[in-house]
Amino acid sequence: MSFQNNAPGAAAADQPAGEGPTAPVVSAVGHVTLVGAGPGDPELLTRKAYRALQTATLVLYDHLVGPAVLDCIAPGAERIYVGKESSRHTLPQEQIIELMVRLARSGRNVVRLKGGDGYIFGRGGEEVQALAEAGIGFDVVPGITAAQGAGASVGIPLTHRDHACTLVFATGHLREDRTVGLDWELLARPRQTVVIYMGVGALPAICSQLIAHGLPADTPAAVVENATLPTERCLTATLATLPALAVAEKVQPPALIMVGQVVQLHPLLARPGTVLQTAQTAQEAKELASA
């Protein structure tokens, strides 16, 4: 029987999620290694992550793991795409866990490959908890999370003695009622950097809520798209103007929202030759929105 996987970057040997592997059982009970793939640039894989990929025989990987990282997987290793995009999953999370447990119980040694760090908004904790409850051995290999990669790549330090003594990561994922359930009073405190994952779809609501809960409308803010990749973009503005800039520039996930005084360092610390994209005034935002 032949299999075809239409996932981005999938090799010819890949199998679609839901199809069982044909390799023989290698032990009575297998093992799972949860590997963080980092923010996208394969040069940012840890040595331990790279070694796990080079010795892998079976890899379950998500949507945010790009072709350059997949190229680091050992030739001949089976790949199963279990991609998860916003509101569109190849497999529901529960079925991903079931598949992982079934493969391990059949004796397979599985690499579970996730973008960024599996324990930071990657649902890795849920997956490892399920493995522990099923009595399956596991290891966790941390990865550079997207916020770290983005900050270093675009020149926005996450903390700075003069600007931010607190760092907060939050998820901007929309709930079923299309609201963002965050602790806005916590996020609106001064002298901190807030990085919001999965928040592009809720960007106007996020900015307006931060302003409503006390942050000045002219607080520096940025959205970083495709961090660390050749297609990376960083748009800087203020809480008041960032939504219009993001619409004008057609920002798409994966992207991070970064809020705080550290954002103002981007023009100074960005790599030489970086084209700065910004909207700092209400007039600029209005012009962008009507463009």
Describe each region flagged by the PLM:
Residues 1-42, 47-144, 242-243:
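Class I S-adenosyl-L-methionine
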Residues 73, 154, 210, 214:
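Active-site catalytic pocket residues across diverse enzymes, especially alpha/beta-hydrolases
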Residues 2-14, 18-19, 29-32, 95, ...:
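A contiguous loop/helix-start segment that scaffolds small-molecule binding in enzyme catalytic cores
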Residues 69-70, 131, 150, 206, ...:
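Hydrophobic packing residues within well-ordered alpha-helices of enzyme cores
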Residues 3, 22, 41, 117-190, ...:
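Class I SAM-dependent methyltransferase SAM-binding "motif I" and its flanking Rossmann-like core
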Residues 48-52, 128, 134, 155, ...:
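Generic secondary-structure boundary signal with a strong preference for alpha-helix termini
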Residues 77-84, 135-139, 158-165, 214-223:
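Short hydrophobic/aromatic-enriched beta-strand-loop microsegments
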Residues 42, 47-48, 56, 67, ...:
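Surface-exposed loop/turn and secondary-structure junction residues enriched for glycine/proline
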